[in-house]
């Protein structure tokens, strides 16, 4: 068919605006944006015709549907709830630690109006946003003072900028870590104006390495916990107690970046020992930073606890305002920390900790329940319960997995990866993994309502 004839078959703007399904978007986005979407689609259609990609007359119904889908994409939120069936509890790409529904309701109540974010109700004048949780952090960790910024990378940057600018920071070569997004300790040091002074080797660093490195230019000793990897074998590192003693002797602050950070021991759940924030403070670290949305089980935040004289310097630094947390984060962090006043409440009410604490038998029961729900439907799958291993994620416990059970689906009619891809396009996307041509639904990261959604949505495939 002649290109000019095909171009003439394209409906004009007014004809398309008369379509009810297209016109109903006008109230939501306005006539200008509506016309812009239609115009963009028409330009794409014309371009395809000119380039020879389309050889037939334009199907008007298909064109209208194409426009409607573009309008839906514009008007519907891009960020949405997904179901995490991967078994990775602190899945970075899926938002890390979930916030409990009870906390969300309290945050919603506060966020839908005004709040006392920076207002002291007792004294009737301006207050500090840290006041809602700093005493809690001190009570829980044994620190003298506390604050929070928007993530742990920001916390490290602030500590270095406020205490180490144009000074040397001594760090073991084995602790020059990189986390996701190519965030590297040396790069953060350069940005902060701190001069990196490496000591030791990749696998071994001794106390005398630190001692020999101290000069008049030394501003701090930085201890970085390698929470997202481990060096094993012929290794040695210096404990924080010995570094803290050296720092006190030489009058140099000792900073500890814990990365994930944890307030409760996880050893009883089959995980190796991870240094707690309390242990670092008791060992004598002057400042300790850690994440809010990893093993703490709260919102994204970079928490700093330690000596008051150093926290006072940090709070007055210009970067603090640029890195400060917002009211929603402050509220979520306070609610999260209050759960730790009784550790049993934290394990029961914080979703991430609750998932970690699940026993293998707990997951077996959940997997059996999900399988039974699936078997009641006429689905083209062979369904079984199989052993599996779940990951903590979020750069925590890199060598440790949690044993449990998963619901396993086998489909002979379709490729496993094709089904997994289709599940990610469902109204409530289900994120799972394909392993040996089987779909693995790890129930450790599923709530009961998630299972109900999975069963309902698998019928749509």
Q: For the regions a protein language model found, what residue spans apply to each?
A:
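A short linear hydrophobic-aromatic micro-motif
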Residues: 78-79, 145-146, 290, 428-433
């Amino acid at each position: 068919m002649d290109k000019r004839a095909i171009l003439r078959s394209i409906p004009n703007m007014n004809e398309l605006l008369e379509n009810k399904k297209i016109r109903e978007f006008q109230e939501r986005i306005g006539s200008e944006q509506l016309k812009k979407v239609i115009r963009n689609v028409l330009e794409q259609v014309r371009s395809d015709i000119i380039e020879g990609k389309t050889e037939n007359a334009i199907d008007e119904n298909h064109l209208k549907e194409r426009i409607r889908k573009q309008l839906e994409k514009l008007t519907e939120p891009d960020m949405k709830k997904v179901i995490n069936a991967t078994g990775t509890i602190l899945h970075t790409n899926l938002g890390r630690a979930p916030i409990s529904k009870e906390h969300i309701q309290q945050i919603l109540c506060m966020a839908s109006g005004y709040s006392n974010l920076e207002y002291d109700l007792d004294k009737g004048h301006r207050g500090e946003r840290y006041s809602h949780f700093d005493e809690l952090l001190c009570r829980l960790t044994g620190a003298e003072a506390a604050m929070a910024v928007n993530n742990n990378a920001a916390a490290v940057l602030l500590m270095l900028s406020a205490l180490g600018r144009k000074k040397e920071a001594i760090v073991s070569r084995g602790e020059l870590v990189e986390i996701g997004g190519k965030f590297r300790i040396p790069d953060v040091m350069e940005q902060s104006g701190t001069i990196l002074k490496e000591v030791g080797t990749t696998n071994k660093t001794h106390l005398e390495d630190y001692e020999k490195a101290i000069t008049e230019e030394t501003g701090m000793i930085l201890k970085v916990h390698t929470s997202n990897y481990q060096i094993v074998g012929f290794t040695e590192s210096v404990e924080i107690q010995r570094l803290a003693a050296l720092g006190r002797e030489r009058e140099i602050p000792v900073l500890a970046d814990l990365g994930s950070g944890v307030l409760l021991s996880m050893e009883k759940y089959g995980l190796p020992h991870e240094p707690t924030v309390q242990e670092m403070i008791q060992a004598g670290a002057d400042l300790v930073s850690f994440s809010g949305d990893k093993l703490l089980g709260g919102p994204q935040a970079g928490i700093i606890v330690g000596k008051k004289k150093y926290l006072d310097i940090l709070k007055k630094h210009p970067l603090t305002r640029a890195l400060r947390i917002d009211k929603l984060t402050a509220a979520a962090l306070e609610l999260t920390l209050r759960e730790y006043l009784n550790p049993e409440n934290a394990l029961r009410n914080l979703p991430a900790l609750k998932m970690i604490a699940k026993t293998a038998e707990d997951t077996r029961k959940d997997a059996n329940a999900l399988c039974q729900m699936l078997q009641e439907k006429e689905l083209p799958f062979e369904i079984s319960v199989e052993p599996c291993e779940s990951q903590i994620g979020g750069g925590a416990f890199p060598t440790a997995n949690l044993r449990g059970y998963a619901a396993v689906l086998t489909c002979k009619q379709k490729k496993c990866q094709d089904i997994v891809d289709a599940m990610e396009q469902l109204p409530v996307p289900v994120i799972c993994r394909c392993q040996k041509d089987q779909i693995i639904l790890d129930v450790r990261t599923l709530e009961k309502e998630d299972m109900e959604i999975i069963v309902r949505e698998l019928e749509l495939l």
